[in-house]
Design a protein with these regions (language model features):
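Conserved redox-cofactor binding core of oxidoreductases
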Residues: 59-61, 67-74, 84-92, 97, ...
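FAD cofactor-binding and catalytic pocket of flavoenzymes
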Residues: 78-83, 87-106, 110-121, 125-126, ...
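Glycine-rich loop(s) and the adjacent beta-strand/alpha-helix scaffold that form part
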Residues: 25-28, 32-34, 39-56, 266, ...
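Conserved hydrophobic helix-helix packing surfaces used for dimerization/oligomerization
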Residues: 10-12, 33, 546
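Beta1/beta-strand and adjacent pyrophosphate-binding region of the FAD-binding site
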Residues: 4-18
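A glycine-rich dinucleotide-binding beta-alpha-beta segment and adjacent secondary-structure elements
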Residues: 215-222, 238-239, 278-281, 432-443, ...
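Conserved N-terminal glycine-rich FAD pyrophosphate-binding loop of Rossmann-like flavoproteins
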Residues: 40-65, 96-107
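Short, glycine/acidic-rich hinge or "gate" loops at secondary-structure transitions
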Residues: 44-47, 163-184, 497-509, 583-591
Length: 591
């Protein structure tokens, strides 16, 4: 039996960065808000303190902060002719399942996406002609501009304690920063993290090649900091336990220690953990949503939570899944090229080289999530001529360390036996002496990369699993080959003792090894309901009181990590709801 609860002004599904931002902003505006999070509450003092957090087996190998694939997963295939099979263990990407979401266990890399992404089709057609874009590449403009988002990027960076060096303030190029970035109103809230040896060596080599290295902006506080909301950060300890871990020092920007505690102190807010939302409910004419149904996973009780506004703020994949399960918006059909929900799923590509320097001591166990140096000469540099190389998109190149832990980090030169005495000797010899140079590359939307509901497999609640159909296309192969050439050229100029050269990802994509937790698309934003699921305010074209906030609204994927625009869009959407929608409920953009 389902228990119907008292109606609230807004219900939030998923409480990570986006849900936390909306919870804080809407409760402060006077709305009664309930947040439903299927994960557990974790706090720094109880769950991420030393020695608890220094457990690679628990947090990295056994995915303690991640979704449990025995209860819910996806089915995976490379193309529509294949049978999709369930992902039985996490690999390629790692969605969080905890209060605070994936922001609890991320590295902190925080970028500003620019009009090169938001106006991607217009800009490429203008520069290279319409025929340059492949017929099956379904990229489109997003319907928003960098100028509109700039104040919200700024707000997120100051909330999340981003450390970095501005490259462009008000149109004036700044020494030491990224000269290709779009103009920002002011400097980062904190100076960059301390450069490590690998980053210093890469910086010198990149400059010799005529490139423009700069410290990677990251939500790892380089010194103690109090953000504008009063949330207090400690300084990064360079402990090496960053990606896949909570932060012992409260130095990593995370919703669980910033916006969420602020919301929880507000009497207008209620958090319910272990609450798995199974469906968004619609009224009789299907033009409004009326709330959600959810199950308490600890005891199996089922509830209906009525609400005036429904906000989908779960991980990107789960937001799309819930839209499909709830029958909101037309499901995408790749053959007919109709429908919008499930359309334009994108991932990222890349290439990397490992360099070995006999006699060097890199101390890779001492690092931060953002202790990298990056070049954007082949990324947001519009002077880089893609036409010569025949691909749409871009990549950034970086060097440094993130998490070099004893179980997972064992760099050895190619040709080393994979086990036994020689392997042991090689891991001991090369652990201290190796560094990495890697590229993160964009993936453009393609007609045949999409989500839909699996016809065979179901989750613990008897609902169809999400089916992901994805593979890299020739565009990504070309991009990856170019990235590998640039990486190898820089690497060879550094004269390593041994070099595992970079190669492009040209084999079919596989879900098995970890690559990145940067899944985008599925309920994309746009200018009209024919091509997109939500408008520029992330409001559903079909049900005006439904908003979905996350990387699922991205119309393609860039080379950058998505959290910067995700956070900015959350503040942007909160602003639109507070100042426009609540005063006059209805579509914020005419269809």
């Amino acid at each position: 039996m389902t228990t119907k609860l008292k109606e609230v002004d807004a219900v939030i599904v998923g409480l990570g960065w986006t849900g936390g931002i909306l919870a804080k902003e809407l409760t402060e505006a006077g709305l009664q808000v309930v947040a439903l999070e299927r994960g557990a509450m974790r706090t720094t003092d109880k769950d991420f303190a030393v020695p608890i957090v220094r457990d690679e087996l628990r947090f990295v190998v056994r995915h303690d902060l991640m979704q449990n694939t025995t209860r819910d997963t996806l089915t995976i295939r490379n193309n529509p002719s294949q049978e999709a099979l369930p992902m039985r263990r996490l690999g390629s990407f790692l969605p969080g399942e905890v209060v605070g979401g994936s922001g609890v266990h991320w590295s902190g890399h925080t970028w500003r996406w620019t009009d090169m992404e938001f106006k991607v089709r217009s800009l490429y057609e203008e520069r290279y002609g319409k025929s340059f874009i492949p017929a099956d590449m379904t990229i489109q403009d997003w319907g928003i501009t960098y100028a509109e988002l700039e104040p919200y990027y700024d707000k997120f960076e100051y909330t999340a304690a981003v450390s970095g060096k501005a490259g462009n303030i008000g149109g004036q190029i700044q020494p030491g920063g990224n000269p290709f970035e779009a103009p920002r109103a002011r400097e980062y809230p904190l100076p960059p993290l301390t450069a490590i040896l690998a980053s210093e060596m890469f910086t010198a080599a990149a400059k010799e090649k005529g490139y423009h290295p700069f410290p990677r902006p990251s939500a790892n506080a380089s010194r103690p900091y109090t953000n504008p909301d009063g949330s207090k950060y400690g300084a990064c300890q360079y402990c090496g336990y960053c990606q896949r871990f909570g932060c012992e020092a409260n130095a990593k920007g995370s919703a669980h220690m910033t916006v969420i505690p602020i919301a929880m102190r507000n009497p207008n807010f209620e958090l319910r953990t272990h609450s798995w939302v199974t469906k968004v409910l619609k009224d009789s004419d299907g033009k409004r949503v009326t709330g959600v149904t959810y199950t308490n996973v600890l005891n199996g009780e089922e509830f209906e939570q009525p609400a005036g506004i429904v906000l989908l703020c779960a991980y990107a994949i789960n937001n799309v899944h819930l839209m499909l399960l709830s029958g909101i918006g037309a499901p995408y059909d790749p053959q007919a090229q109709t429908g919008v929900v499930g359309k334009n799923y994108c991932y990222q590509t890349g290439a990397s080289a490992t360099l070995f320097f006999e006699g060097r001591q890199f101390n890779p166990f001492m690092s931060a999530g953002g202790s990298n140096t990056t070049i954007d000469d082949f990324n947001i540099n519009w002077d880089f001529d893609r036409g010569r190389h025949g691909f749409v998109g871009a990549y950034n190149v970086a060097a440094g360390f993130n998490t070099a832990l004893p179980i997972g980090y064992r760099p050895v030169p190619r040709g080393t036996p994979q086990w036994g005495k020689e392997w042991k000797a090689a891991t001991a010899k090369w652990y201290q002496t190796a560094m990495n140079i890697g590229a993160s590359g964009s993936v453009m939307a393609n007609r045949y990369n999409y989500y839909d509901l699996d016809p065979t497999y179901r989750n613990a609640f008897g609902q169809p699993l999400m089916r992901m159909t994805f593979d890299y296309k020739e565009n990504e192969h070309k991009l990856g080959r170019h990235a590998a050439e640039i990486i190898n050229d820089i690497a060879k100029s550094m004269n390593p003792t041994r070099l595992n050269e970079a190669t492009a990802r040209t084999l079919p994509w596989t879900v098995v090894p970890y690559q990145s937790t940067h899944n985008t698309g599925g309920t994309i934003m746009g200018t009209n309901p024919r091509d997109s699921a939500v408008n520029k305010y992330l409001q559903s074209w079909d049900c005006h009181n439904l908003f979905t906030v996350g990387a699922n609204v991205f119309a393609h994927n860039a080379s950058y990590n998505p959290t910067g625009p995700v956070g900015a869009l959350a503040y942007w959407t909160a602003d639109a709801i507070k100042n426009r929608y609540v005063k006059s409920p209805g579509p914020l953009v005419p269809a």
